């Protein structure tokens, strides 16, 4: 009974503190001392409203605008974001460039990897408007980031480079935004370049997307030319979000990241109701409940507020913090405790599928634990990476990592090296294969070592299917022949060829994913002198003739470098493997034979000759029988050594062999 009374009293006192904070008045110190620890921490953390918060509080939902910038990679999204932040006074002019590119790898490569958000206040015709901007990635590997960003937006700036024109990912991003009902504002960037051709690009946009050329805004994000005319276009053309403050809280989780002090921080879009520090909310996906510790907006960094209201996008973290990132399921719906039956949860987002797999091993097994911690920290902020432990006889304990594409994999590797100082060995990328067994069951195999050898496959496997993608390539017509030849040599199947202007072509090919990850984009850029662009989407699994290629050293397979590939590639890859591996293996006291084998068929072979001891040095030249006897004895000794001796291959040899 006493414990029940104590609990009820604690809840009542917490409610009192919460109520006083709602009324905007700080509590007296004597009252603070009588509160329980948790309620006291909320009350002491109270700060009076600042100037920014007062301005936001006076803006009705009808004057909110949530929008994103979408474009092909390197068309100037992040630079344009900087100009908009400067125009609204959110950041100082001429300060930190690419302010929404927060990762070192983003600044180094000049690309956006994670969608970043920022709120701005813009005064238009005497009224304040709350603008919420999302800077999205342009590369196809991060399409899931773009798709999630659209859920928090009512419109988008469709940005096109005035010199390059409509590119493959411009097309893909347009249809993705159009399918989600976003209002699109066409924007031409880099109009100040000498080779910019706005009339041609406007014609492309009209022919490809049926967008009105008169509605386009022509700007130069680098110099700031005409950028000021973009904000009125956002206010006038992009609709305000729909929401009801009087309804129970309905909040969508758009993204999350990990903070070592606060735990998991959630980026949320509030559709109905409002949320404040001290509220208890529940997740529909997990059923877990949390006490809100802090709410705020990104301005451009985390800026605490006393409330997040319907129509706003902001961040939230809990007290005590959410320590397991697995609890934060992107696409989840949250509501206040007790309102679960009054709120309809959102359907959530489709989980992105890993399309490329690599194995990762530490260069020194003593660093295994440190590397494991580093990988886990990065995967907390990038939920699209899949992780599974594995081990290799040659390279020791490691992990099988799944990525959305080769750039995603490369960025992850760079972050490991730059942010955590990790030294790692990464195997060449592989793709998942679907195996249909003779008993009718199916398996998706992502690890080449688990793929059945040709001898087993003959008895156990009925069919093997490999993943295909539909590649959309935009290019000038003068390179059409070279690109068709490249696609055909990579087992591509032509689906569509369209001239969307007199000199620009859109090609659509179904291409095996295994060829796409094998530097197809680099070859495409080489064939077109950098003028082609590429976008792709999943095209399902197609039946194919697939075998496993093993590298053998003195008859023993080296598991770390097994590969699954099409039969047409076996001879070429096998010969290249043997020649490359031979260079990195040191000579032994016995003969070392390196072979590439597909099942029992030896595709290629190389021999490393042993060190030779001169057993005839002390013999007289005429002693032929003794000479023959010593040579025979040496030959027998080598056979015995080869039978019982194991080839010592240094870790560095694997590192050099697996290097690109």
Swiss-Prot record:
Keywords: GTP-binding, Hydrolase, Membrane, Mitochondrion, Mitochondrion inner membrane, Nucleotide-binding, Protein biosynthesis, Transit peptide. CDD domains: EF4_II, LepA, lepA_C. It catalyses: GTP + H2O = GDP + phosphate + H(+). Its EC number is 3.6.5.-. Residues 1-42 form a transit peptide. Pfam families: EFG_C, GTP_EFTU, GTP_EFTU_D2, LepA_C. Its main location: mitochondrion. Coiled coil: none annotated. Promotes mitochondrial protein synthesis. May act as a fidelity factor of the translation reaction, by catalyzing a one-codon backward translocation of tRNAs on improperly translocated ribosomes. Binds to mitochondrial ribosomes in a GTP-dependent manner. Belongs to the TRAFAC class translation factor GTPase superfamily. Classic translation factor GTPase family. LepA subfamily. This is Translation factor GUF1, mitochondrial.
